């Protein structure tokens, strides 16, 4: 039976210490080799927490598979906009201002793990996160941008 270890690691900076080392040790894997592979697969997400799953396919041969998830939408937005954090009181403060192009970039990165069937739906989902984080889009409230997209006044091209 395949055993799995799921954890969150900082992109490109996993170590043999907790949480990975103690979780993989009992499975008999070469922890240093697994960590090296995780860092290689997550380097594009540096500075962000990334979900990682290590599945031992065959305990006899120690064959394993590493699956890297997509960081949370909020982490992708913070990286795209160079923000430390979102606004703590979104009604009073604006954490940042994004372009529609930046929102599309985040949506494209996030789409594999979203339920959205097309880019337009993914962009609307990312705009929802912008609302929660206090991020304006093109100087407007993200809810307003969502309405403009739904009404067809703003077109989202693939």
UniProtKB/Swiss-Prot annotation:
GO cellular component terms, semicolon-separated: large ribosomal subunit
CDD domains found in the cross-reference section: Ribosomal_L11
An example Gene Ontology molecular-function term: structural constituent of ribosome
InterPro entries in UniProt: Ribosomal_uL11, Ribosomal_uL11_C, Ribosomal_uL11_C_sf, Ribosomal_uL11_N, Ribosomal_uL11_N_sf
Alphabetical UniProt keywords: Ribonucleoprotein, Ribosomal protein, RNA-binding, rRNA-binding
Record SMART domains: RL11 (SM00649)
Disordered: region residues: 1-21
Pfam families found in the cross-reference section: Ribosomal_L11, Ribosomal_L11_N
Biological processes, Gene Ontology terms: translation
Function: Forms part of the ribosomal stalk which helps the ribosome interact with GTP-bound translation factors.
Cross-referenced PANTHER family: 60S RIBOSOMAL PROTEIN L12, LARGE RIBOSOMAL SUBUNIT PROTEIN UL11M
The protein's assembly and partners: Part of the ribosomal stalk of the 50S ribosomal subunit. Interacts with L10 and the large rRNA to form the base of the stalk. L10 forms an elongated spine to which L12 dimers bind in a sequential fashion forming a multimeric L10(L12)X complex.
Similarity-based family: Belongs to the universal ribosomal protein uL11 family.
Name of this protein: Large ribosomal subunit protein uL11
Gene: rpl11
């Amino acid at each position: 039976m395949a055993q799995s270890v799921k954890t969150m690691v900082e992109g490109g900076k996993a170590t043999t210490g907790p949480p990975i080392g103690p979780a993989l040790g009992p499975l008999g894997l070469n922890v240093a080799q697994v960590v090296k592979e995780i860092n290689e697969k997550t380097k594009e997400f540096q500075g962000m927490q990334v979900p990682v799953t290590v599945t031992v396919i065959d305990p006899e041969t120690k064959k394993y598979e590493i699956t890297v998830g997509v960081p949370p939408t909020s982490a992708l937005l913070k990286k795209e906009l160079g923000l430390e954090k979102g606004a703590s009181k979104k009604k009073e403060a604006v954490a940042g201002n994004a372009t529609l192009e930046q929102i599309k970039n985040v949506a494209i990165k996030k789409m594999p793990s979203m339920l959205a069937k097309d880019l337009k739906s993914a962009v609307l989902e990312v705009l929802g996160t912008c609302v929660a984080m206090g991020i304006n889009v093109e100087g407007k409230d993200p809810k307003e941008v969502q309405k403009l997209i739904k009404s067809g006044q703003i077109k989202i091209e693939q």
